[in-house]
């Protein structure tokens, strides 16, 4: 299960965080703080939108996170892979720089997971006034 860079930019920080390996399924999120407790790795990217954080979260059957060694990323470039099965990627943008599609927001409010594929539209960048 390979994952890609969410944005293009220079990597300014990397961090590995030890943790447990709880399932990342929706039902578990109601009982545990999985994004806080699970093993994870992140990189902070310096992008045209400002700092963007991309974090890979390990899961119950995914004990290993393999990130490629590189100093910068291009949006859509393979960033790494999980050792077994699938897991979760979190991408945090500066406030006011993106707008998520309404269907994703609606499903999230209802506690329904939205699975996406590479190239599928999930939102849009907003115009930034300097």
Pin down the residues of each PLM region.
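Contiguous, well-folded functional domains in the mature portion of proteins
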Residues: 1-130
């Amino acid at each position: 299960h390979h994952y890609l860079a969410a944005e293009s930019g220079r990597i300014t920080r990397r961090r590995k965080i030890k943790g447990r390996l709880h399932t990342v399924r929706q039902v578990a999120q109601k009982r545990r703080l999985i994004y806080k407790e699970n093993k994870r790795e992140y990189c902070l990217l310096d992008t045209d939108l400002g700092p963007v954080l991309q974090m890979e979260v390990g899961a119950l059957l995914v004990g290993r996170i393999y990130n490629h060694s590189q100093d910068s990323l291009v949006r859509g470039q393979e960033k790494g892979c999980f050792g077994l099965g699938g897991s979760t990627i979190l991408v945090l943008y500066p406030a006011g720089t993106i707008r998520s599609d309404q269907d994703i927001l609606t499903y999230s409010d209802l506690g329904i997971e939205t699975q996406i594929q590479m190239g599928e539209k999930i939102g849009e960048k907003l115009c930034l006034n300097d």
